Amino acid sequence: MAWFKRDNPPQAKGPAHRVKVPEGLWTKCVSCGETIYTKDIENNLNVCPKCNHHYRVSSKKRLELLLDEGSFTEFDAGVVSVDFLEFKDSKSYQDRIDQALAKGGSKDAIICGSGRIEGTPVQICVFDFSFMGGSMGSVVGEKITRGIERALSDRTPCIIVSASGGARMQESILSLMQMAKTSAALAKLREAGLPFVSILTDPTTGGVTASFAMLGDINMAEPKALIGFAGPRVIEQTIRQKLPQGFQRSEYLLDHGMVDVIVERSKMKSQLSSILTMLYRP
């Protein structure tokens, strides 16, 4: 049995050293489940390189992607939300505003201003979903209306990029009236023969969908964006039926005539420029 003997007895190993991986280095795609180097997603315009899932982006990033470099001028940056009704649920509305401002992004759920898209002058409003879910309150409605009015006075196209959970409940009727206010302003833009292009991104829901977001001369959408009024879960609970596969996604809306075209983020600027060239004459 000597052949079972070892010439060198096993040595006790020291404790294993774990390699510390920085947080956020890798991202697991919420769509395909692949683990991807985060920088690869960021370098791909926040789109998964494996399955083409379009992640949400900030309003500032969206402006960078759509407008010519250095052409953007922001308007109405000083208009901020006020707690008119002294609304309080689990916390006060003012506390929610302060919490959103502390994130260091936008001062409200939208940024508006003027810029150029491949040389064409435009008025543009871009929602920021990170600010209270992109909800539309009196400030959002006012800034959109002013943007439309500037497009009227300057005779330029108007573009609105939506990403919103709908009307801001903390402002009650003051938020709901923004639906009529923005729609009335767009009616004047149409009477003047100036184009309005609505870009629908994930998610576009509630009072935003039920007003200006679906009133575009051209309604564009990003792939697989959630677009609807009530959410699919609420609808299923109400009608007590299972909804069709892909219901309320941009592809479903395209098939049913609610969206004119679906455009990937990387092609959005060039496609938008082509549309403006056809619809707008300075």
Curated annotation (Swiss-Prot):
Keyword Transferase: yes
Pathway: Lipid metabolism; malonyl-CoA biosynthesis; malonyl-CoA from acetyl-CoA: step 1/1
UniProt entry keywords in alphabetical sequence: ATP-binding, Cytoplasm, Fatty acid biosynthesis, Fatty acid metabolism, Lipid biosynthesis, Lipid metabolism, Metal-binding, Nucleotide-binding, Transferase, Zinc, Zinc-finger
Protein name in UniProt: Acetyl-coenzyme A carboxylase carboxyl transferase subunit beta
SUPFAM superfamilies per record: ClpP/crotonase (SSF52096)
Subcellular locations according to the entry: Cytoplasm
Cellular component per GO, a single term: acetate CoA-transferase complex
GO biological process: fatty acid biosynthetic process; malonyl-CoA biosynthetic process
Catalysed reactions, semicolon-separated: N(6)-carboxybiotinyl-L-lysyl-[protein] + acetyl-CoA = N(6)-biotinyl-L-lysyl-[protein] + malonyl-CoA
Cofactor, free-text remark: Binds 1 zinc ion per subunit.
Subunit comment: Acetyl-CoA carboxylase is a heterohexamer composed of biotin carboxyl carrier protein (AccB), biotin carboxylase (AccC) and two subunits each of ACCase subunit alpha (AccA) and ACCase subunit beta (AccD).
Entry cofactors: Zn(2+)
